[in-house]
Amino acid sequence: MDEKTKKAEEMALSLTRAVAGGDEQVAMKCAIWLAEQRVPLSVQLKPEVSPTQDIRLWVSVEDAQMHTVTIWLTVRPDMTVASLKDMVFLDYGFPPVLQQWVIGQRLARDQETLHSHGVRQNGDSAYLYLLSARNTSLNPQELQRERQLRMLEDLGFKDLTLQPRGPLEPGPPKPGVPQEPGRGQPDAVPEPPPVGWQCPGCTFINKPTRPGCEMCCRARPEAYQVPASYQPDEEERARLAGEEEALRQYQQRKQQQQEGNYLQHVQLDQRSLVLNTEPAECPVCYSVLAPGEAVVLRECLHTFCRECLQGTIRNSQEAEVSCPFIDNTYSCSGKLLEREIKALLTPEDYQRFLDLGISIAENRSAFSYHCKTPDCKGWCFFEDDVNEFTCPVCFHVNCLLCKAIHEQMNCKEYQEDLALRAQNDVAARQTTEMLKVMLQQGEAMRCPQCQIVVQKKDGCDWIRCTVCHTEICWVTKGPRWGPGGPGDTSGGCRCRVNGIPCHPSCQNCH
């Protein structure tokens, strides 16, 4: 088949498609060309051979790394393979030059229709293989030019070449430079190599300032550096300005959120009590508490009702009130803060709590002295070089050596008078003798801290001194804990340390 006959067949097919598609301009151009060439034609009407309704095509996609994925495409049987490639390019970003279609076990060509390959109903399958683009220099300009040429080919113009906009007027020939025959225009200036970084995944050439691939969104190589002399174009400047504005708004919103959180914490810290914001259950009385009805302890975040916390404070024998939470695993060692206690109690109960703390501090100190005036609350911490204490409450002078008030007598006169009165006081003498017998028989003992006489009524071997509140092990006649207080096993009886009781006769000293 000669070149003229082949060209005539192509123009006839283009005329057929233009008439079927209603394109008057293309049909007129094809008809004029056929008439000028005096090509013999036979025109006849025929029914529609390719259905035009939309169907769903099942496509298996595989790349050069043997990664496979299945997708569904909505197509028409009269679509060409070139149109199918353009659709995949627009929807998924894979350039047509990288697409290789296999339909009906045949390699599909661009100008062939899907109907010619047997794609006629829903569920028909096709195979798409994505070629590696490592050896292909892709850029947006070439992709756009290829797409325009493909659209012209669909219209029947296969031998056209896209030229830049505006007329190109050849200049006068230079003297002394002969022109080669057959060449009416000078050679086109080759385009400079594209500036940018090549995506390691799809090999697309991206602009230097872009942080990720425009095609596959892969991150820019860390080793790439933007050329110092590079000037971004208008599109890049707009994108960079948008990124800067987004970053500024993000930083502004973050700062506003931080300031709001700070103000919220300041307002929360100014409150004496932290109330619950969600429904909770008191672990002591098991009452279900609505938001705002319970108190959340600041130190340990355990939640209780007000009544249980008030009862815990009133019944506490310590200056520091512990959290009442306890279960089968552990008991909480957190403490209630002073402002929490003050907010929970009435003024009278809070004053009693303060008095209890002062009393405990006085009794637990080895250098404290309480005024001997009956019902007087005055006391002090004394030093070795001080022998007298003037009570700030009752204003009586206490002798720290005799531990008594003898304002009209000196120490010698007072002790002689005391011995004389003891000989004549039968009740005082009987009490002294009874205490001595109890100490000798082991029915009583002296507190290892304040030396007062204490005794155990019944039950376990743990007792507490009523004066200095020292915890005592009855069976060892010594303190239960070390100098650090409850839980300090560096001293005391060290009961149950390594599972060993403090004494063979120990009856649980806690």
From Swiss-Prot:
One term under GO cellular component: LUBAC complex
Domain Ubiquitin-like: 55-119
This protein's domain notes: The RanBP2-type zinc finger, also called Npl4 zinc finger (NZF), mediates binding to 'Met-1'-linked polyubiquitins.
Positions of Zn(2+) 2 binding: C300, H302, C323, C332
Protein name as catalogued: RanBP-type and C3HC4-type zinc finger-containing protein 1
Organism field: Homo sapiens
Region of interest (Interaction with TAB2), residue spans: 1-270
Keyword Coiled coil part of the UniProt annotation: yes
